[in-house]
């Protein structure tokens, strides 16, 4: 007699509970932001809808010491990507992937630091900055983002690189390591756990669910972009400068010109939709089918990260089947490569010079 088949109801029930959580929390987050909007309008209606004109980029975005602005059009999607490159062509490639709400400029300290021994490329991800931004939400699925990096590597004439990712760029870096391990000499991730750790942890820990509330808020069409833009992009400025979330407590490592660079880029017409569309596809792409990373890996973590609980960093090791080092920096914020650049650069140098091998 054949063994009884497991009831089909259980997977269906799990899926129902999962999507009920996603959309239920999405509705809650939307309600909170709607109340914030109404409060702002009630207090200062004119200020709420005011936006300063920003026709010209700040001078720091054209600083020649950071490198050369370049563009590459990849074959598969036909999209054109913008990047800033420093260091001589022909040197080993170091590819830098930024997070949200960032762009290539988040790597300014690393562009200067590593150009002596590497061809350092700081990319604007799909939909960000001067890179092309497809209109359709489906164009931002994780499979597309992974394919972008593979095709960019080919277009730059490299088969391997040192890959460094922060925040959402860290998510993509982990996935590249899972899908295309042969492309990565060494993997460095800053303040983002292995994606499988993240998806499992967030469902079991309400505190992390709260910290990641923007993932759910971003599922709503158009409203998140609007909320980021009111009060002359106050929410964007707050992320980088507030006591709780800022770069080095109240943004002490961020100059006025640095902050204006971020506001300039994201204040351009339609500049927020592409970045937020990255998040609008995440729940349909996870959990992963494959998990293990076989590349030597360094995970750097700011202990004062307002968005990610440090316990996720410690659990990540189980998904790396190779050399793995975790370094947690006390008083480091979520924006670690900008917050403590000298320390971060030193740790990266040490890891790059270590003799590690692929198991």
Curated annotation (Swiss-Prot):
Keywords in alphabetical order: Hydrolase, Membrane, Signal-anchor, Transmembrane, Transmembrane helix
Gene: Ephx4
Regions crossing the membrane: 15-35
Domain named AB hydrolase-1: residues: 92-337
Taxonomic lineage from the root: Eukaryota, Metazoa, Chordata, Craniata, Vertebrata
Origin species: Mus musculus
Protein name: Epoxide hydrolase 4
Active site per UniProt: 167 (nucleophile), 279 (proton donor), 334 (proton acceptor)
Family as reported in the entry's similarity comment: Belongs to the AB hydrolase superfamily. Epoxide hydrolase family.
Enzyme Commission number(s): 3.3.-.-
